[in-house]
Amino acid sequence: MAKEDNIEMQGTVLETLPNTMFRVELENGHVVTAHISGKMRKNYIRILTGDKVTVELTPYDLSKGRIVFRSR
C-alpha cells in the first residue's frame, strides 16, 4: 500500500493494552486501537497514558492504527 493512502491524525493515549497496543482517542472523538511502529519499537520509545501521539490510519479499517510519533 502506498504511503499516500494513509490518514494521519492526532490523538491522546487513553490506556495501555497488552503486546504494545494502546487505546487512543483521536481529536474528532473516535477511539481506535493502535500499535507502535517498528522504528519506535527499535529505538525503545516509551509511550505512557496521556501522551499526545500521531496515528496513521488506513482507509480500509478506521478502528485500527499505527502510532508513528510521540509529541512531547
Curated annotation (Swiss-Prot):
GO terms for cellular component: cytosol. One of its GO terms (molecular function) is rRNA binding. It is found in: Cytoplasm. Residues 2-72 form the S1-like domain. InterPro entries: NA-bd_OB-fold (IPR012340), RNA-binding_domain_S1_IF1 (IPR006196), S1_domain (IPR003029), TIF_IF1 (IPR004368). Its main location: cytoplasm. Transmembrane segments: none annotated. Keywords: Cytoplasm, Initiation factor, Protein biosynthesis, RNA-binding, rRNA-binding. One of the essential components for the initiation of protein synthesis. Binds in the vicinity of the A-site. Stabilizes the binding of IF-2 and IF-3 on the 30S subunit to which N-formylmethionyl-tRNA(fMet) subsequently binds. Helps modulate mRNA selection, yielding the 30S pre-initiation complex (PIC). Upon addition of the 50S ribosomal subunit, IF-1, IF-2 and IF-3 are released leaving the mature 70S translation initiation complex. Component of the 30S ribosomal translation pre-initiation complex which assembles on the 30S ribosome in the order IF-2 and IF-3, IF-1 and N-formylmethionyl-tRNA(fMet); mRNA recruitment can occur at any time during PIC assembly. HAMAP family: IF_1 (MF_00075). Belongs to the IF-1 family. This is Translation initiation factor IF-1. The lineage of its organism: Bacteria, Pseudomonadati, Pseudomonadota, Gammaproteobacteria, Enterobacterales.
